[in-house]
């Protein structure tokens, strides 16, 4: 089995090393990640600059691009034979609810699925992020299960693991995405030259963290698995929009 591993925290991040070590037990892995932290990169591609590669001492390959660039480049150019699966992570922090729209971790998995391969994204949720070994354990279990029973062709699995010792995790829940309140405002400050600058503020608190959501599962000590689709069409709105279309006049 061949597995392509990527992330958005950068090729030197602790999470991608833990994930690679775990998956090396069952697969031939190729680890290709951005040369810097690309958190929040979503599905962005590098279109105006060339991509430069560097092979590190541990065999990982760094790319001067986004997580999506990494997966696209690896599959198109670095593999003689295609991988069997794409695994993205282990992200340093949650990718739940609205986070998935901005996440480079989820985007790397999404690019794998766009290109026709089973794909999962895995994140470690907590404040101190001590237990990458727990997330790696569940990544290994889930990859083994996918090897035996693949999921639908147009889906990826978004996995969030509570930052707990393995023995304290209560199990796995299949969940839907929750939702956050609107993000807090920008942080206004000055650079050393006295010029005004802005930082993005923290994300909003949970708005929908009810039973059945990813937020609820992780908060209660469970691993959350949420199936995501790459087709963003709101199918339930199609017929309503057909009726609405009659209101548009020349």
From Swiss-Prot:
Record-given protein name: 5'-nucleotidase SurE
PANTHER family: 5'-NUCLEOTIDASE SURE (PTHR30457), 5'_3'-NUCLEOTIDASE SURE (PTHR30457:SF12)
Cofactor: a divalent metal cation
Chain residues that bind a divalent metal cation: 8-9, 39, 91
Known function: Nucleotidase that shows phosphatase activity on nucleoside 5'-monophosphates.
Location, primary (coarse class): cytoplasm
Gene Ontology CC annotation, any one: cytoplasm
Similarity remark: Belongs to the SurE nucleotidase family.
GO molecular function, one term: 3'-nucleotidase activity
Cofactor note (record): Binds 1 divalent metal cation per subunit.
NCBIfam families, per database record: PRK00346.1-3 (NF001489), PRK00346.1-4 (NF001490), surE (TIGR00087)
UniProt superkingdom: Bacteria
Catalytic activity: a ribonucleoside 5'-phosphate + H2O = a ribonucleoside + phosphate
Subcellular location: Cytoplasm
């Amino acid at each position: 089995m061949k597995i392509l591993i990527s992330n958005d925290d950068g090729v030197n991040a602790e999470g991608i090393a833990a994930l690679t070590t775990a998956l090396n037990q069952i697969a031939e892995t190729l680890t290709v990640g951005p040369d810097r932290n690309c958190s929040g990169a979503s599905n962005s591609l590098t279109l105006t600059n060339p991509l430069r590669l560097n092979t590190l001492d541990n065999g990982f390959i760094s790319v001067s691009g986004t997580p999506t660039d990494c997966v696209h480049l690896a599959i198109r150019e670095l593999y003689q034979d295609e991988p069997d699966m794409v695994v993205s992570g282990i992200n340093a922090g949650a990718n739940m609810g609205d986070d998935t729209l901005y996440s480079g971790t989820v985007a790397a998995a999404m690019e794998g699925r766009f290109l026709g391969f089973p794909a999962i994204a895995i994140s470690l949720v907590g404040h101190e992020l001590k237990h990458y070994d727990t997330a790696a354990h569940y990544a290994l279990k889930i990859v083994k299960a996918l090897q035996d029973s693949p999921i639908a062709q147009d889906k990826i699995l978004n996995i969030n693991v509570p930052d707990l010792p393995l023995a304290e995790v209560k199990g796995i829940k299949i969940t839907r995405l929750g939702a956050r309140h609107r993000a807090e405002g920008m942080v206004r400050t000055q650079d050393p030259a006295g010029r005004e600058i802005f930082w993005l503020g923290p994300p909003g608190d949970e708005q929908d963290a009810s039973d059945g959501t990813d937020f609820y599962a992780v908060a209660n000590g469970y691993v959350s698995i949420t199936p995501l689709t790459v087709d963003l069409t709101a199918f339930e709105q199609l017929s309503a929009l057909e009726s609405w279309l009659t209101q548009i006049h020349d």
